[in-house]
Amino acid sequence: MRPSKRAADAMRDVTLERAVARYAEGSCLVTFGNTRVLCTASLEERGPPWLRGSGKGWVTAEYAMLPRATHERTRREVNSGKPSGRTQEIQRLIGRSLRAVTNLPALGERQITVDCDVIQADGGTRTASITGAWVALHDCFAWMRARSIISVDPLKDHVAAVSCGIYKGQPVLDLDYAEDSAAETDANFVVTGKGGIVEVQGTAELEPFTDEQFLELLRLAKGGVAGLVELQRKAIA
């Protein structure tokens, strides 16, 4: 049995609260159970230098954890001089996921930076970040359209993400920290609203996993993402 007593295919309670940051063009507070992430989307009128003259915009992301988001205080990464390898990996993943569903030429030569700040971590911070970041980005684009900065919605589709793993021999959906820290296999799936796969990250911690187990994890993930996309739709309605 899972520590949370959830069924194998059950997500934690998920909420998406919009417009939580007064000054950001778009914002969302996302919760996956006890994991809470504040996502803000900010418009910058200039894109990256390497896109100058291309007529194309850019979407990028930054990720950070508050010092007491975890059981014990962690040092702010700014005090060490640079982001950790884990932080860089996660923020690149968030950016790739958002760009996969964005029509970049529709932005013009502008950049949207989505900041994902983990308030409380209980597993699945990167998947929660992607799911909430999409809502913040949606609202940023709506803000831009309302002011005639852009004429069309650059979003091509929804995107959301969920973790899956093998815990005590059983494939399960949406691991919390207790499961993640003891799982034999841990994987993250980023999937669009139409069911297209943006990215898969999977690691066997103890025993290699089989093709059959991977396909079961994929099935669980697609079901989980379908539910998350429906929550996104309701949140922006």
From Swiss-Prot:
One of its GO terms (biological process) is rRNA catabolic process. Keywords: Nucleotidyltransferase, RNA-binding, rRNA processing, Transferase, tRNA processing, tRNA-binding. CDD domains: RNase_PH_bact. Its EC number is 2.7.7.56. It comes from the Bacteria. Phosphate binds at R86, G124, T125, R126. One of its GO terms (molecular function) is tRNA binding. It catalyses: tRNA(n+1) + phosphate = tRNA(n) + a ribonucleoside 5'-diphosphate. Belongs to the RNase PH family. Homohexameric ring arranged as a trimer of dimers. This is Ribonuclease PH. It comes from Methylorubrum extorquens (strain CM4 / NCIMB 13688) (Methylobacterium extorquens). The gene is rph.
